[in-house]
A protein has these predicted regions:
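Glycine-rich phosphate-binding loops that contact phosphosugars or nucleotide phosphates
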Residues: 2-128, 136-140
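Short, amphipathic alpha-helical interaction segments embedded in low-complexity terminal/linker regions
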Residues: 22, 131, 136-219
Length: 219
């Protein structure tokens, strides 16, 4: 996206790595990283194919544009179609120029400040991005019930969270969960399968690999 939609896309993509343990989601904003903190006027007017040079038919591209006519986003969607990728457009205008395999129209109406789409339109876009990324990750097996079992244990807070996830998912006490998590190299999903299936972490990892990461199938 460009401007606010681009920042929202980058924000949602950035959260997928720690939450779901995947680097497969990348945010792209017109004007590059500098546009995250500074308005780069004019960046939205043209799309540079180099921004998506590595896009393939195995990918999906989500373009976000409140007006449905931002040149940068329309160019990105066209580039993705040419590459054979799945395309999704999130827009806030009915019948806009944005063309995609899936078009999500959020009819949020006029802004309190006319034209300031960082307000109602941006809020609605973020809600949809949350729902979209979370539902995709659930479908890919990166959650078990309401628990983010692929969480990356990169700090003390997330370590405590991972222990609680293992404890609750496996129905064990905190001491057992802590030991299982340590034995599994900090990987909550592996610890859960090991505890519920009564196997060691190595066998749990093999089961998860066979099940393409889905805890239920691994059990």
């Amino acid at each position: 996206g460009a401007g606010t939609p681009g920042r929202l896309g980058v924000l949602d993509a950035a959260e997928c790595a720690p939450t779901f343990g995947t680097d497969a989601v990348r945010g792209v904003i017109a004007g590059g990283p500098a546009a995250l903190t500074t308005a780069i006027e004019g960046a939205e007017d043209t799309f540079d194919p180099a921004d998506l040079a590595d896009l393939t038919a195995a990918d999906a591209l989500v373009g976000i544009t409140a007006s449905g006519r931002t040149p940068y986003v329309l160019g990105a969607l066209e580039h993705a179609r040419t590459a054979g990728a799945l395309t999704v457009a999130i827009v806030n205008n009915a019948g806009s120029e944005a063309s995609a395999d899936v078009v999500i129209e959020l009819l949020t109406g006029p802004e309190v400040l006319a034209g300031s789409t960082r307000l109602t339109a941006g809020t609605a876009q973020k809600v949809v991005l949350n729902a979209l990324s979370t539902s995709v990750m659930i479908a890919l097996g990166r959650a078990y019930g309401p628990r983010m079992v692929d969480v990356r244990v990169t700090n003390a807070k997330l370590r405590r969270r991972a222990v609680r996830i293992v404890r609750d998912a496996a129905g064990v006490d905190e001491h057992t969960a802590t030991a299982a998590l340590a034995a599994a190299g900090g990987h909550a999903k592996t610890a859960i399968v090991a505890l519920l299936a009564g196997v060691d972490p190595a066998e749990a990892a093999v089961r998860l690999d066979r099940a393409r990461g889905r805890v239920r199938d691994a059990l």
